[in-house]
């Protein structure tokens, strides 16, 4: 057990444009080297592109895309008698969102468009339609969990 006290959770303020807490957290995932203004410009630019293409509420598209990426189960390694098993476990809601955001940003960074805002917009729209690299990542994780269902009795 750790000897120190558990660090207090920092409160994240809602983003200024849409007033959404989840969008503010997403900006923190996009941010590199503490450059929040750059991250805001990228995210708002991406949402503007989504609004142009979808003619709807970009925040709704963002939330549905995140939901399409968020995993329900994942595998954790568990060592039992010299053998390591991949044990499927349910994902906590906070971790679901964190993984979805991480996978979305990673998939966007690997895309080929010119600017990060365009990449992010493209990945958001793909995820909204149930395709794209981030959704593929989720399906791979679910497939791994399904393949290792036999070891689910080794729960943590």
Curated annotation (Swiss-Prot):
Pfam families recorded: Ribosomal_S7
Superkingdom of origin organism: Bacteria
SUPFAM superfamilies xref list: Ribosomal protein S7 (SSF47973)
A GO CC term assigned to this protein in UniProt: small ribosomal subunit
GO molecular function: rRNA binding; structural constituent of ribosome; tRNA binding
Keyword Translocase: no
InterPro entries: Ribosomal_uS7, Ribosomal_uS7_bac/org-type, Ribosomal_uS7_CS, Ribosomal_uS7_dom, Ribosomal_uS7_dom_sf
GO biological-process terms attached to the record: translation
Keywords per UniProt: Ribonucleoprotein, Ribosomal protein, RNA-binding, rRNA-binding, tRNA-binding
CDD domains linked to this entry: uS7_Bacteria (cd14869)
Family the entry assigns: Belongs to the universal ribosomal protein uS7 family.
Primary role: One of the primary rRNA binding proteins, it binds directly to 16S rRNA where it nucleates assembly of the head domain of the 30S subunit. Is located at the subunit interface close to the decoding center, probably blocks exit of the E-site tRNA.
Quaternary structure, from the entry: Part of the 30S ribosomal subunit. Contacts proteins S9 and S11.
Entry protein name: Small ribosomal subunit protein uS7
Origin species: Stutzerimonas stutzeri (strain A1501)
């Amino acid at each position: 057990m750790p000897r120190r006290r558990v660090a207090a959770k920092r409160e994240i303020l809602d983003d200024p444009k849409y007033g959404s807490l989840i969008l503010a957290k997403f900006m923190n995932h996009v941010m590199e080297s503490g450059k929040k203004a750059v991250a805001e410009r990228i995210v708002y630019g991406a949402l503007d592109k989504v609004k142009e293409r979808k003619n709807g509420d970009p925040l709704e598209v963002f939330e549905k895309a995140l939901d399409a990426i968020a995993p329900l189960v994942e595998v954790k390694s568990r060592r039992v008698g010299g053998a390591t098993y991949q044990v499927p476990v349910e994902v906590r809601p906070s971790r679901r969102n964190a993984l979805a955001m991480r996978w979305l940003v990673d998939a966007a960074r690997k895309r080929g468009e010119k600017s990060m805002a365009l990449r992010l917009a493209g990945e958001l729209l793909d995820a909204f339609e149930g395709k794209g690299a981030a959704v593929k990542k989720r399906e791979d994780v679910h497939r791994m969990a399904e393949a290792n269902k036999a070891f689910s009795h080794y729960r943590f």
